[in-house]
C-alpha cells in the first residue's frame, strides 16, 4: 500500500467516522494554504484531503482496507493499485472484469406480492347449480398513511450514502491471480439504492399493513372438492406498494344426507319391501330439482340401479348435467305372524318354490366327497 491514510490523518485503523472527520478538520485548519502558504504544507494539505476522501467514503474505505487504492485510477494506475488507467470509475473497472455485472443497478423496492389462499365450504346444491358467497380475507394492503412508500409523512426515501444509489458495493480480494474487484448487494440499503431515514409509524417502513376485507365470490356451477377459483389481484400487496398477488378460493363440498357425488353423477339408495319389488311401485324422492317419483318396475331385484338422466350435477365445462343413479335395496321380513306365514307358503306352493332351488339335493356328491372316494379306490 503506497500511502498510509490513517497515519496521514493521525487516527487508528478502527477510528469511527466522527473521529476521522474531527482529525481532518483539525489538520485542515492548520494546513490550509490561506493559513500556511508554505509549499511543503500545501503538499501535506493535498495528502490529508486524499486521505479523508478515501476514509470518509465507506465504499472507498472498504476497498482501501482490503489492500487496494481507490484513488489510483485517477493517476493512471499506481504501485499499490489496479493499474486501471483509462477507467473513469468503479463501474468501468467492473465492466472490464465482469462485463455487464456492474450494470445490474439497484433492485426495485416495488415487487409483486405473494398469492394467498382461503378455503370455503359449499352445500351440494350450491356446487351443482352455482352461487355467490361473501368471504372475509386477511391480507396485506397498501398502507394509507405512506401510500406504500414506507416513509413517514413529510419525508421520503434518500439515496444510500454507502453505495451512492447503485445498490451494490465493490470490494477487493487477493488471489493467486492478484487483486480482483467484485461486487455484492449494499449491506446498508439491501441493494435498493435508497434508505428510509424515518419509517412510517403505521407500517414500520414496509409500505403494507394487514387488513380484513369482504369479497364476493362467484361459485360456478359444477365445482367439486379441491376446485380452486382464481381472483386476480386480490392476494397480498407487494413490498413498497407493489402489485398484489392472486387469491385462490379452494372449494370444500359438504357431505349430503341423501346423495353421494361421483364426478357429476349423484347416487342414492331407496329401500323397498319385497312385495313392492315384486309388484312394482312408485317411490317419492326429494332430488336437487324438487320432489320426484322413482318408478320401481315389477320384478325389480335388490342391487338394481335405476338412472334418472339429467338430474345430477351441472358439468363445469360444457353444457348439460350428470345423472341421478337410484340403487334399490329390497328388504325381507324378519318376523311373520301365522297368517303372513300361511300366505307366503301358499305363494311358494303356487310358484313351485316349496324347496329352495339352491338347496343341496340328496344323492349328489360334493367335490371333497368325490376326491375322498377316488383316494380310497371306490
Swiss-Prot record:
Gene3D superfamilies: DnaJ domain (1.10.287.110), Heat shock protein DnaJ, cysteine-rich domain (2.10.230.10), Urease metallochaperone UreE, N-terminal domain (2.60.260.20)
Residues reported to bind Zn(2+) 2: 160, 163, 186, 189
Keyword terms: Chaperone, Cytoplasm, DNA replication, Metal-binding, Repeat, Stress response, Zinc, Zinc-finger
Domain J positions: 4-68
PANTHER family listed in its UniProt record: CHAPERONE PROTEIN DNAJ (PTHR43096:SF48), DNAJ HOMOLOG 1, MITOCHONDRIAL-RELATED (PTHR43096)
Zinc finger (CR-type): 130-212
Entry-linked Pfam families: DnaJ (PF00226), DnaJ_C (PF01556), DnaJ_CXXCXGXG (PF00684)
Record's subunit section: Homodimer.
Family label: Belongs to the DnaJ family.
Name of this chain's protein: Chaperone protein DnaJ 2
Chain's gene name: dnaJ2
